Structure formats: structure tokens, C-alpha cells
Amino acid sequence: MALTMTAHFLRNNPIQLGLNLRVLLMLSFVSGLVYGSQVIVPPKVNAVLGKNVTLSCRVQVDTNLSLTQSSWERKLPNGWVTLAVYNPMFGISIPPDYERRLSFRSPSALDATIMLEDVGFADIGVYTCKVATFPLGNTQASTTVSVLVEPKVYVSAGSSALIDGGNETTVATCIAERARPPADVSWETNLYGMSEAHMQEDANGTTTTQVHYIWQPSRHAQGHTLTCVVKHPALQSDFRIPYIINVQFAPDILVLGYDGDWYVGRENVQLKCRAKANPPAQHFRWIRLDGEMPNGAERVNNTLVFTRPLQKNDSGVYRCEVANDIGLHSRDIRIRIQDPPSTTTMPPTTPVRLLTADISATAPGNKQRALITSPTLAPLHEGSLGTIVGGAVGGALFLLLLLILAGVYYQRQRRTFRGDYYTKQYHGPSDMQKAPQPHELQQVYSKGSPDTKLKSNQDNGTIYPDKDREEWGDFDRERSPNGRSRALREAGQLNHHNHQNHEHGFHSNHHTGHPQSYSPAHHIQRSSLQPQPRRYPAPQVMSNGSPYLPEDCYDNEYVSHTDGSMISRREWYV
């Protein structure tokens, strides 16, 4: 508005242009200084009823400005009321109505914070902090004060006692009384109950909140804890109050003392009745159900004591009755008195030394058990010695049986034929083609059969060395002079030495450059010369590569084995 009026004036009065320009520059400078000061207050402050509250006011002033004074005012229905004034030159001024309750915290050109004590509901309202600077003028900011009422919290028990097995009832009630605003109330527990809340409006805008916990009582929850939890802005932290549940129930009874081994003559025995009850049990009673209480059985509080040795007629059913304010419960127990244990003595034993242990046996008249002492062995129970000896003997017999079986198996393996009964097929290992012993050939060829006589050489009457069957693999390269195996040659030599007085005739047809052939032998007088072996045709290699002779080249169809048995060349053995 000032700038508009100045421009209008300059249009109408151009002569005063220079003076008005100076005025315009001054107004612009003042307008820029408006943004050079600032008052900072919180928008809202919560005060607790009956306690102190702080109203903060910070002043930010530019260096080109100077603080004249700072003050607090309150708006009432009939207008504004000044609460406090601070002037750097004249000091602090507070009206008499607030002189005892209001004060500046630390007055200065930058701080106008005040403190209000003993806040009441009348202090609710809007408060304004004003700052006067030169040449700018006044700057202000307002805050709203609310009064909170801290609740009064307590827990009360239900109207009726908690009886085990009763109906659902109120266990306890958590109350947050006269709170502003209303408090948040709840129960914390591990029981399976439910909460029920009620709220009541009071004067001055406060509220009372009640939360009931409803649950069906059970003796198993005796001693458990409920926790009342209250949350409110006036509280620095959650308010928690524990409540212990008290459930009343009739006695739970437990009878002690009977171990099932009561026998005639046993002494110092008793039956004790223990009861768990709320309230505590006040009455105990022992009775016998199947007859009169025997003589010598006395009732002492909750215990039935037998003051004499047990007798057979003490057997029976006994009952313990326990009562309290809630009810009466009982527990029955059947007692069986057995025959006395036998007193037979153990038979005498002889001392036995086992390893390093010293064992002493009991005497016939001594009731002490065998004592075993050893630095390395723990004492053995009766009968353990026999078990150990029996186990050792059994183990030795088992090892002996294994050795016998191993020997039998080894002997059978040695007598087992490892060759092939099919003599027309060659098998490699040389130990399967061992030459027969002389005494074995003697049994085969000593019967005088013309087909089994040895043939002599027509030329010089000597027996040429020949290769074994193991060497038949190179039969084509080096042929035996007489075409016979070493076994036949050795057999011929044996017959020559053992039968010098017998006559054997050997005839052979020998043609140079033709294959040898043989014919049946004839008996002739035995000369001083050695018998002449007969030449046999050279063995032909079979089409399957076997170096054995054809079947018609052998004198006999049986061949001897190392164990003395005879094996046919033509038969199959299964």
C-alpha cells in the first residue's frame, strides 16, 4: 500500500521526484528487514495435572535489529492477558496472579522461555510469545497447552472366591481411574480366559477404565500370575501390576510307606498320608474297610504306625480321609502281609583262584557271602565263577572243532583230481600231466596182455629218450625216436629189471622213409640184451590243436592216475 501511494504521488508531483526517491528507498529497506527476526515455539505442549510445565520460546534476531522487549500473553474469553514481560533495560515484570507460579527460565535477548508450576485445568488454553525489535516492530508465535491427568491404577480381586471346578467368574479387575485422555488397560496371562472392559466419564473430562478378567477356576492354575498393564501419555513407561491367582480346592491325597514287601515279623513300618489342599487340610483320619483296626496300629496325626512286628491278619484295605473347608477326600490302599523270607544257608564252596583275584568261600554256618578282593577286578556275584569257567571251556571246544574241520578239508583238497576227464583235450598246467609212477604202471601193464607189452627198437635194442607230454607243444619240430611217452619208456625199463627170467618177443616192421607201423607182439626167449622198444607212429596234431595221439595209437584205453585209480580214455565221468 505504501509503495502504491508513493508511485501515485510521484506521478502527480514530478518536482519532488528527488525527495520521494529517497523515501522509497527507505521503505524498501524496512520491508527487507521484516524477514530478519523469528520467534520459535512448539505448536502444542502437554502438561500433567499438578505438575510443572515448560513453555519454550527462542528468538532469532538479525544483527541490524535490536531487541526492545519479550513477553508472554494468554487469550481468555474476555481478551488477552499479559503473563510476563522481559525488558533488557527495565528487567522482568509478572502480574500478581502468576507471580508464585510463573518465572523466566533464563531471560535474554535470544531466550524468552517460561516455567508454569502446579498446572491445573484452568491453565488449558493458547499462549503467545511476543518479541518487539527496533526498527522492525513486533513478532509473535503461539502454542496450545493441554492438561493430561495421570490415571490412578490398582487391581481388585473378584467378588467371589475361586473354587476348583466352579463356573466362570471374575478373577480380578484392573482399574485406571480418572485419566485424561482415557488409559489403555489390558491383562497379560497364559490362561484361557477373556477380558471385559468398562469405561466411565468423570468430571473435568477424565475417564475411568475397568477391565475384568473372566475365567473358569481350576486347581492346576493355583499360584499362576495375571499382570495388569496400563498405557497412558502422562506415564513415562507402561504401568504393570501382577496379581497371583488363588484357587481353592479339596485335598489331593498321597499315601506313602508301603513298598509291597511287607512280611510277617517285619518291624518299624508305617503308612503316611500326605495332602495338598487350599486352604490347608485340617482333619486326618485312618480307618480299615474290611475289618477292625488291628491292635498295635496307632494313629498319629496323618500317620498310621505299627508299633509291633507285622502279623498275617494285618493284611487288608486301609483308608486315609482328609478334609478342609472345601470338602473331604479319601485314598484307599491294600496291604498284603507275605510269609517271612526263607533262612536257608548257602551250600559250602571251595576257594577258586581266578587271575589275580582272591576268592574265599563261605562256611556252612556262616551267613556272609563270598568275599572277592582284587586290585584289578571288581567283586563277582555268586555264580559268576561258574559262568566264566563254562565260557572258557566252551570257547576251547569250539576252537578245537574248527581245527578238526580245517584238517579234514585240507586232506580232501590234496586228494582231489585237478585234471580233466576228457583226455582228448589238452590243458595247460604241467602239474595236471605228471608222469605216472613206476609202481602205478606196474599194476597196469604187468598182466601180460599182448596189447600192453613194451615194444623194443629193432635197430639197436635201446630205449631213446623222449619228451613228456608237457613238451608236445613242439612235437612237430622235434619228434621222439620211438613215438612214445616217458611213462611208457620208464615202465619198459622197470619190466626189464623185474622180469629177467621171462621171455618177451617184440617184432616190428620198419621201412625207411615211411611212417612207422606196429603189429601184435609175440613171445620170444629173453636174451641178455635189453628189450627192444617198438616204434610208434608219430602223433598227429589234431584239427583242434591238441597234441594228443589219436585213440587208436594207445595200447590200452585206461590210464593210471596219481592216486592209484584207473581212468578210461573213452568214457565220460560225471
UniProtKB/Swiss-Prot annotation:
Keywords from the named record: Cell adhesion, Cell junction, Cell membrane, Disulfide bond, Glycoprotein, Immunoglobulin domain, Membrane, Repeat, Signal, Transmembrane, Transmembrane helix
Coiled-coil ranges (or none): none
A GO biological process held by the record: homophilic cell adhesion via plasma membrane adhesion molecules
PROSITE patterns in UniProt: IG_LIKE
Membrane topology: Single-pass membrane protein
Location within or outside the cell: Cell membrane; Cell junction, Adherens junction
Residues modified by glycosylation: N52, N64, N167, N204, N301, N313
GO cellular component: adherens junction; apical junction complex; plasma membrane
Extracellular side: 36-387
Disordered as annotated region, ranges: 442-484, 498-549
Keyword Transmembrane helix found: yes
Biased composition (Basic and acidic residues): 465-481
Ranges per topology, Cytoplasmic: 409-574
All copies of domain Ig-like C2-type, residue ranges: 151-240, 251-336
Pfam families: C2-set_2, Ig_3, V-set
Occurrences of domain Ig-like V-type (ranges): 36-146
Disulfide-bonded cysteines: C57-C129, C174-C228, C273-C320
Transmembrane segments: 388-408
Signal peptide stretch: 1-35
Family: Belongs to the nectin family.
Biological function: Cell adhesion molecule that promotes cell-cell adhesion through heterophilic trans-interactions with nectins-like or other nectins.
Name of this protein: Nectin-3-like protein
Biological source species: Danio rerio
Gene name for this UniProt entry: nectin3
